[in-house]
Regions:
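Nucleotide-sugar donor-binding catalytic core of glycosyltransferases
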Residues: 1-48, 52, 56-66, 70, ...
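N-terminal Rossmann-like NAD(P) cofactor-binding module of classical short-chain dehydrogenase/reductase
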Residues: 76
Length: 361
């Protein structure tokens, strides 16, 4: 079967994109995969709204042209927030493609720019919607979803299975007691500011975009910023050279999880994450395969405890690594495909299911 994978693909090999990690697992399932980068920018500057509108029109027309040429049995979209409902309908009508979307943000988060009107209006057009939070399923059904599957932020096992070599230079460059890898946000800065002020003896390393733009040189955080966003093997080196990797959950993720929930355990390193139901109970078990915090005081206590108890850290690292192996992209996509085939039959990919929800755990 032919599958058109629509996502953000970077031409810069140093920049990791999640969509790229879907290619090999889908090929292993027997799909002939063709990719389409929906974030191609045809203007040097995107400052003008007219440029944005024209660019979106070009992208939508190019996607339709690519689909008409390739005639995919399945079009698998990863976010694809700029793809218009009319484009989806045209592809369904002219190519008879089965449309799937995995949305890695909240599809209803218009308030912070993580979703668009295209997505909200397009929810009912997709044949199958994949979502990382059980809490969002009722809203998706109300929005007209035909079929919904719970699909966690599975990690790329091919990337995380690769051996990394830590040189002395790497150790000097990445070494820290506590590490955070992620984009600047006010709430994240507040948490890290508390750590700096209450635990000044710790070595804190921050990697991510927008930190230098938002943290003034007078802030206690400024000298903790090591650099911009890091990905792939570079990120794994930062994890390996730190005793504790912190994870903060955005408000839009509610009681769910995020990419770091699995990436850190998959790296065989220690994760200390903001407590959510999914992380502490559903995906891992708090105190055995994951460590969590909810308040500044609890965060300080957990940092001090685990910094001084390497054996306790190692137990959780081993348990979390084993548990994370259930959440590789290869396994989760295979479960999804098997569930679909068992439900509908291998030759019935175009038939539609009305308002049903399937769950992958």
């Amino acid at each position: 079967m032919k599958l058109l994978l629509v996502g953000y693909f970077s031409q810069d090999p140093s920049i990791y994109t999640y969509a790229t990690s879907f290619i090999h697992p889908l090929q292993k399932l027997g799909f002939e995969v063709k990719t389409f980068n929906y974030r191609t920018n045809f203007f040097l500057s995107g400052k003008f709204r007219l440029h944005t509108i024209i660019n979106q029109c070009i992208i939508n027309q190019q996607l339709l042209n690519a689909a008409l040429k390739f005639k995919p049995d399945v079009m698998f979209c990863i976010k694809a927030e700029t793809i218009q409902p009319k484009t989806l309908l045209a592809i369904k009508k002219q190519c008879s493609s089965y449309l799937v979307n995995f949305y890695p943000d909240s599809p209803f988060a218009l308030w912070n720019g993580n979703s668009t009107v295209n997505i909200v209006k397009g929810i009912a057009v997709y044949d199958h919607f994949l979502i990382w939070s059980h809490e969002l399923i009722p809203a998706l059904i109300s929005a007209g979803c035909k079929q919904i599957s719970y699909f966690p932020f599975a990690f790329d096992n091919e990337l995380f299975a690769q051996n990394i070599i830590i040189t002395e230079k790497d150790q000097r460059y990445f070494s820290s007691d506590v590490c955070f890898v992620g984009t600047w946000e006010p709430e994240r800065a507040q948490w890290l500011d508390i750590i700096c002020k209450k635990l000044p003896f710790l070595t804190l390393a921050i990697w991510g975009n927008e930190w230098f733009n938002n943290v003034p040189p007078t802030s206690v955080l400024y000298n903790k910023i090591r650099g911009n966003a890091i990905y792939g093997m570079t990120m794994r080196k930062a994890f390996a050279c730190s005793k504790i990797i912190l994870n903060f959950i955005r408000r839009q993720n509610i009681q769910a999880h995020n990419m770091r929930t699995f990436e850190v355990p998959a790296s065989k390193t220690f994760l200390l994450t903001q407590r959510t139901y999914d992380q502490a109970t559903l995906l891992f078990k708090e105190g055995e395969s994951i460590a969590c915090f909810a308040t500044p005081d609890e965060l300080m206590q957990k940092i001090i405890f685990y910094i001084n108890n390497e054996q306790e850290r190692d137990i959780i690292v081993q348990n979390s690594f084993l548990r994370a192996q259930e959440f590789t992209l290869e396994k989760q996509l295979s479960k999804l495909y098997t569930s679909f085939v068992n439900q509908k039959g291998p030759h019935d990919i175009h038939s539609k299911t009305q308002n049903s929800a399937s769950f992958i755990t």
